Amino acid sequence: MEIKYLLTVFLVLLIVSDHCQAFLFSLIPNAISGLLSAFKGRRKRNLDGQIDRFRNFRKRDAELEELLSKLPIY
């Protein structure tokens, strides 16, 4: 084989092995820990807090609209 083909094959193998290593050593452990914490119930979502924040946001938005409607238009 010519050197340019060997170099191309080497670079492709290097890139593929780098992606496989990143997949194996980062994605899989994170997925396993996410599944374990989901089974243990650590990641329960607090929907009441989210609903309260949404209500506060809507209230502030309405107050801002009211304030802007009272300002004169230049």
From Swiss-Prot:
Its main location: secreted. GO terms for cellular component: extracellular region; membrane; other organism cell membrane. GO terms for biological process: defense response to bacterium; defense response to fungus; killing of cells of another organism. Changing N30K: Shows important increase in antimicrobial activity against E.coli (MIC=8 uM) and slight increase against S.aureus (MIC=4 uM) and C.albicans (MIC=4 uM), as well as slight increase in hemolytic activity (32 uM for 100% hemolysis). Residues 46-74 form a propeptide. Changing S26K: Shows important increase in antimicrobial activity against E.coli (MIC=8 uM) and slight increase against S.aureus (MIC=4 uM) and C.albicans (MIC=4 uM), as well as slight increase in hemolytic activity (32 uM for 100% hemolysis). Changing S33K: Shows important increase in antimicrobial activity against E.coli (MIC=8 uM) and slight increase against S.aureus (MIC=4 uM) and C.albicans (MIC=4 uM), as well as slight increase in hemolytic activity (32 uM for 100% hemolysis). Expressed by the venom gland. Keywords: Amidation, Antibiotic, Antimicrobial, Cleavage on pair of basic residues, Fungicide, Membrane, Secreted, Signal, Target cell membrane, Target membrane. Has antimicrobial activity against the Gram-positive bacteria S.aureus (MIC=8 uM) and the yeast C.albicans (MIC=16 uM). Causes hemolysis on horse erythrocytes (64 uM for 100% hemolysis). Minimum bactericidal concentrations have also been tested against S.aureus and is four-fold higher (MBC=32 uM). Belongs to the non-disulfide-bridged peptide (NDBP) superfamily. Short antimicrobial peptide (group 4) family. Negative results: does not show antimicrobial activity against the Gram-negative bacteria E.coli (MIC>250 uM). Does not show effect on four different human cancer cell lines. This is Antimicrobial peptide AcrAP2. It comes from Androctonus crassicauda.
